[in-house]
Amino acid sequence: HSWLMTLFAFLISDEFPDANMDKVIKMCIIHDLGEAFTGDIPTFEKTKENEKTEENLLNNWLDTLPENYSAEMKSLYAEMTERKTAEAKIFKAIDSLEALIQHNISDLSTWSPNEFELNKTYANDKVAFSDYFTQLREEIRKDTLKKIEKN
């Protein structure tokens, strides 16, 4: 997931000339490191308590890194969480859209029952800031519907 997100960010960098896409790529690389400690919990199952546990374990690990890396990563995580900068918004759109693409690639037997409806609307709010991402989301939705209809 992180690798494909990183490639995604690199390949669309021309679409966002005013954004620091190197920062977006760094966000893509590090965003799921906390899951190394907690496991991958699906977004629709993750609770605030899960998020807090993951954050605490991640911060404990970040504190073991050399200060320059720890500080940069903590800064990136804060920016991603606040989701106010163009880079953080681009990162979150990529994260959400890549997850949908993974679902469209995967066999329907791997989908949980709620994903059949969720995948039709998921990420709409994450892409609304960008015409480019909104159009891409619509193309991914079309692929989702085709996949469901074929089954």
Indicate where each model-derived feature is located.
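Active-site helical microenvironments for divalent-metal-assisted chemistry
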Residues: 1-151
